């Protein structure tokens, strides 16, 4: 296996179970546990998280689960690797009743690594110091919430100059834009947060709302090149373009982009061209569009059968002309946009045993991406990893030999995974949301 220097190929599980049942007298040769591929766990067996496989690992819950979230870029600097970490998220809940939902700003801080500082000796003074250190290293969470009627399907954050905003798709069939500056301010100040929660949160309203879609939707993306330009797609197959206007408002083109025949599942603006975007749909297709053309004629390229079933998610690489897709068929596919007319992906990976729910390219490493699935797996991949046939290397475990060479890491331990994002300012840090809550982690592989 030829791998990049310093990169481990890991198939450890991150299942955070409490204990492992093991009979030393019957212990046989160790094997790597492969979810969905090997024999099921025996009665009394449990998976144990291998903390040595993680540089960072933290979990958080917010009450009602969140179907979607986005990372809010901050002013703490780029390429942050020094621990403890701080980060900001904007998320929306899926509560049991429509009136119980919230749009939330989360500040997670004091996030230490998994490797504790070594301590020697066991006298009382050192034990007291260890207890104090443990208390000081507890992760912290501040939460500012505003009421939102209706479950939130998707949240995407953008900066309009110095103003952070969130685009919010909800089950009530509206897309709203919320200003986030006040929420960001109060999660940094406990006293201001208390005043906000007591006196202000109920008064926070969207700065703009669009009810022109014919129903609810999930697809939403801010342009990375034109501040304020927005795309929204619904379950009725329509995509609308939002153009910012003076005074902090938007002009939404009532003419939808025509092409898909079923629900539009995801949208991605090109990172290099102002007017080009990609879409994927439950009609199994991926389409490339150019907004300079009339909406009825804007579809320039189509792969009609990109997956065997719904195409759920796409991610457009910021560094290479690649589009990544994940579908109900559990497949991950990499498309070279220079060869998109061929209708064939340049790579296909079938590790997930259930629909893929989220995909995203690493913001700094051009060949690395992550995916989550309804099989409760998060997988990390590197296109640059391949076996060197001249090296003579072979996998000692037959289960590992059957794995894709590019698979770096399999993380487990979540329930009903919905979305993941790499932190753009903290290399290698992944955040996911699931029914079981939020997880922030970094593996030894990326």
UniProtKB/Swiss-Prot annotation:
Stretches for region Disordered: 1-29, 111-141
GO cellular component terms, A-Z: chromosome; cytosol; nucleolus; nucleoplasm; nucleus; protein-containing complex
Acidic residues composition-biased segments: 121-136
Record localization: Nucleus, Nucleolus; Nucleus; Chromosome
Domain of life: Eukaryota
Record InterPro entries: G-protein_beta_WD-40_rep, Glutamate-rich_WD_repeat, Histone-bd_RBBP4-like_N, WD40/YVTN_repeat-like_dom_sf, WD40_repeat_CS, WD40_repeat_dom_sf, WD40_rpt
Modified residues (Phosphoserine): 119, 122, 344
GO biological process: DNA replication; nucleosome assembly; nucleosome disassembly
Phosphothreonine: residues bearing it: 10
WD repeats: 212-252, 259-299, 306-345, 351-391, 412-445
GO molecular function, one term: histone binding
Keyword Phosphoprotein: yes
UniProt keyword terms in alphabetical order: Chromosome, Nucleus, Phosphoprotein, Repeat, WD repeat
Any Pfam family: WD40
Known role: Histone binding-protein that regulates chromatin dynamics and minichromosome maintenance (MCM) loading at replication origins, possibly by promoting chromatin openness.
Subunit structure and binding partners: Interacts with METTL18. Interacts with CDT1; origin binding of GRWD1 is dependent on CDT1. Interacts with CDC6; origin binding of GRWD1 is dependent on CDC6. Binds to histone H2A-H2B and H3-H4 complexes.
Name this protein carries in UniProt: Glutamate-rich WD repeat-containing protein 1
Protein's organism: Mus musculus
Lineage summary: Eukaryota, Metazoa, Chordata, Craniata, Vertebrata
Gene of this entry: Grwd1
